[in-house]
Amino acid sequence: MVAPMYGSPGGRLARAVTRALALALVLALLVGLFLSGLTGAIPTPRGQRGRGMPVPPASRCRSLLLDPETGQLRLVDGRHPDAVAWANLTNAIRETGWAFLELHTNGRFNDSLQAYAAGVVEAAVSEELIYMYWMNTVVNYCGPFEYEVGYCERLKNFLEANLEWMQKEMELNNGSAYWHQVRLTLLQLKGLEDSYEGSVAFPTGKFTVKPLGFLLLQISGDLEDLEVALNKTKTNHAMGSGSCSALIKLLPGQRDLLVAHNTWHSYQYMLRIMKKYWFQFREGPQAESTRAPGNKVIFSSYPGTIFSCDDFYILGSGLVTLETTIGNKNPALWKYVQPTGCVLEWMRNVVANRLALDGDSWADIFKRFNSGTYNNQWMIVDYKAFVPGGPSPGRRVLTVLEQIPGMVVVADRTSELYQKTYWASYNIPSFESVFNASGLPALVARYGPWFSYDGSPRAQIFRRNHSLVHDLDSMMRLMRYNDFLHDPLSLCKACTPKPNGENAISARSDLNPANGSYPFQALHQRSHGGIDVKVTSTALAKALRLLAVSGPTWDQLPPFQWSTSPFSGMLHMGQPDLRKFSPIEVSWD
């Protein structure tokens, strides 16, 4: 076929289309430049500018020093004994699927300076990973080409109002341990942001963080609910989508108590860091206040994220805390999501982890200022109350908390754990009042037992297979389990084909056929599944250690490989192409 000349009718049409496309591109670029300030777009790391894709070093250690005469803060290489804080990053992502970050602060300095310094040194050692993670996950959030003006303005206004309300509460309650920890958390985030931008200066008065800057990395869980509450037209959350599996297993004879968690997430998020924070914070702002019990914490996390987000924590207080998301399907409850009177979930879990000594105190701290966002079932395991080989203490070993907008329900589940020998969590509320209030009965009526607490696929698999767990290795196998092509409990009767990769302890939704027929979004083909497992035991938790594996399960299935997957075009900077890693033991000297 001969291409039409511009003078012909077809040529004039081609020329008009070309001009329109060029104009659209220019406008898109201008809009992108205009909106970059609103979205908090981040620059390439300073040392990598002009060199293409940033390349993180195999290891890096940096310290933040305070000049006693000038009061100036200065970043230096290496670990210095007089530093306000130091951090070391070992990048083994290509070898194990994990980078490892160790961060210490110095108790000779006040809490506020320690917190700010913690953020500074973390960004200083992980800036390349932060850049790549941002590009993979949130660069277009409220940004060019995917911008919803109304929603993004509402989100920005909500976050600004919430930050302002918290600032007032910190001023009004300047002797409160709770608000002291909130302030330290925000200072740590401020230090992270300042350090990445190359403008380190401790804020001596009021300070703020950018509502659509690095705060976006902290509120990824809260955003799932804020999007709905603030009427975002297009949300990324698939109806029915699972978000983590967890199992607490009492071994025969009560000889050990194992705690395990696997995170379900979009595969773009598989740039992982295992973190160790050793803070020297006091509980409250007073000089005579004692050290916070949760200053030592090990957790699975992500670049630029100062909490777990999975969530899974091993704490120096003897607690292990973890959650799976239960969400909210009842539109009438979104009225409880307000910018004032609430602290977003990510920050409440940081404060509870740092201040609590047991499950009761953890729940009391966490349920204050319920935001109604990132609605989860939390499990608080207190290893101090567990006696290996002993009878049930009756209470304190396991506390379960469930949150939805306007409601938090808490109960001690120790007796049930000892009676059944396991507690499983799989994104469905266990409390009847929460289940009913969250709108799930309507989904059960429409779609059947897939949405029910006892009848969902994972509920049935855990009930059938928990007795196979007798040590750490068998716990790891169960938490990686996905034999959806052969397991009758993985069948979806309303699907074509019936076997479904979502219906397993560790999902592999990428393996569902793109041309299949499915009753709701969670069962479709998606770049989504279980992306890790973390397991600890009585002895490991006491030593702040764990077993961990990174990447989608490949025990019964082929390993995930970006280049051969249907999602090869998705941005996944810094990630290995083939995810075929074995479990490792995570420990620090």
UniProtKB/Swiss-Prot annotation:
Chief localisation class: other
Q: How is it modified after translation?
A: Glycosylated; contains mannose 6-phosphate sugars.
The EC number(s) given in the record are 3.1.1.-
From the UniProt record, which GO molecular function terms apply? Answer: phospholipase activity
Domain of life, per UniProt, equals: Eukaryota
Location(s), subcellular: Lysosome lumen
> Which GO CC terms are listed, alphabetically?
extracellular region; lysosomal lumen
Q: What class of enzyme is it?
A: hydrolase
A Gene Ontology biological process term: phospholipid catabolic process
Q: What does this protein do?
A: Putative phospholipase.
> What is the protein's given name?
Putative phospholipase B-like 2
Please report the organism this UniProt entry assigns to the protein: Bos taurus (Bovine)
Taxonomy, top ranks, is: Eukaryota, Metazoa, Chordata, Craniata, Vertebrata
- Which gene is the coding source of this polypeptide chain? PLBD2
